Amino acid sequence: HCVTRRQRQMCIRDSSTSYVYTFVSAFGEEGPPSPASTVLTKVDGQTVTISGMDTATSKSNTNLANKRIYRSNTGSNTTNFQFVKEVSLATASTTDNLNNDALAEIIPSTYWIAPPDDDTSTYPNGQMLGLTAMANGIFAGFSGKRICFSEPFLPHAWPVAYRITLEEEIVSIAMAGQVLFIATKGTPYIAAGTDPQSMSVIRMEAAQACLNKESLVDMGDLAIYASPDGLVGASGSEITVLTAGLITPKQWQAQFYPSTIKGFLWQGKYIGQYYTGSAYGAFMFDYRGGKNSFTTISSLATGHAQGGFTDPDDNELYLIDYDSGGGNAQVELFQGSTTNTTQTFKTSQFVLPRPTSMNFVKVEAEAYSGSGITVKVFGDGTEIFDATITASGSVFSATGSAPTSFSATTIMEPILRLPTGVHKVYEVEVSGAHTINEVCIGESIDELRAI
């Protein structure tokens, strides 16, 4: 019992306390606290020596520079560690003589641990991948089935409480408008929220798996990736197969090898590179362009693109290009040449109610110079016509190789007669180094002239 005023004051000022310290990088990034020291009794005004603090950085490759020391302080309801002082990394011991009421802010980094790393004893699914910036300074990443979020504006701090486990294995993540799109090996998810403590994760009602993490691209207002059925677009809570009216799932799998697709953003368009097993191919897709939006490209780079970056300052796509042997890496500007490359466009299948004879094909292009414009027509899956149109002034010339070869024939307009035959399913393919405005087939020449 305290029987005098002086003894009563000493009882109030005596307190049980302990210390922790944190590492701080040269950039001000603070880590989680050390284990607490042995509890001791401290009286205000008493000097305590703090010793045994680590001074080496061998356990971390994070450019550590300082240590922050905190002391426990018990209030009326809770006990918190409060700031005492900051010392250099090389300091192994220091002293503390602060009174309780002189202690500063409560330690903020109690739960600020690093993201999952490659220590499989702690993280069996491996290190965190897919670092993505969200709104309000939050970063997201994933490991296995777990989606992780950082503290706002602190990309080094990833509390365990901010990690959510999904039902599906995560393949990749990207922003899709105002939400985070989570592509998986099964059904995709979205995550939305302004605070990592209250993130909402929703499973979408569409079984569209992501076949390759490198196919997922943030297009600004939506995310696009390669699924088994075609290119899929995700915006908000909506998900759509964008190429459904252009390419059938069977064509998509057979011609574009979606599990190999690497995607890039170029001037609002999705650029894809794929690998057939023996050669590289590419395509360009404008999701706002309707039925004329999908164009194949002979090649994306001189060799093949290993990676790429869209520069927001000039809206250009820069590719890391490798030659066919896998060496001689260089950076190339996509579409940086003044010479047009050959483009190829093939329509989707036109299925007629009954077998019909389509007798003419028309190709309207900006120019027909050089190697001209080649047009192929397919009937019921078989190539029935192959010809090339060139022009000199207003006079056109056509040469062909199907159904049989024919030499240069002068024509007055870019309309060609097709071989006789009836078919129920038609497809048309055009290629050339000039802008092609229109391609159509019809039963009569007057029908095409009227278009």
Language model regions located:
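Single conserved hydrophobic/aromatic residue that forms the stacking wall/gate
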Residues: 1-8, 12
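Beta-strand-rich modules
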Residues: 15-28, 96
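Beta-sheet repeat architectures centered on beta-propellers
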Residues: 26, 45-47, 208-211, 218-222, ...
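Extracellular fibronectin type III
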Residues: 26-42
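Conserved aromatic anchor
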Residues: 45-64, 96
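Solvent-exposed loop/turn segments flanking beta-strands in beta-repeat/beta-sandwich domains
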Residues: 57-69, 73, 77-78, 370-374
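Recognizes extended acidic, P/S/T-rich segments that occur
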Residues: 67-115
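Short loop/turn segments that connect beta-strands within beta-propeller blades
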Residues: 153, 193-196, 237, 287-289
